[in-house]
Curated annotation (Swiss-Prot):
Superkingdom of origin: Viruses
Organism classification: Viruses, Duplodnaviria, Heunggongvirae, Uroviricota, Caudoviricetes
Full protein name: Gene 79 protein
Pfam families, per the entry: GP79
């Protein structure tokens, strides 16, 4: 009786492991990755009253200078 129980649990563990490995193999490795940083802060010489910020209106990189009066 004990042997059947051990065999059943072993089969369950093997199936679970195979399922996990299969799911990882099918997953896209770049799916959870953030966009790579394609800019350098030196490329955005902000004025004295501006800060480097991230916003959709700045174009494809979404990075640019924001005036301090626009920040809450």
């Amino acid at each position: 009786m004990e042997g059947r129980r051990v065999k059943k649990h072993l089969i369950t563990v093997v199936v679970a492991f195979a399922t996990a490995v299969g799911a990882m193999a099918l997953a896209d490795p770049y799916e959870a990755s953030a966009d790579p940083i394609t800019f350098d802060q030196r490329a955005f010489p902000c004025e004295e009253d501006e800060v480097l910020g991230f916003a959709p209106e700045f174009g494809p990189d979404r990075v640019g200078c924001i005036h301090v009066d626009q920040i809450r």
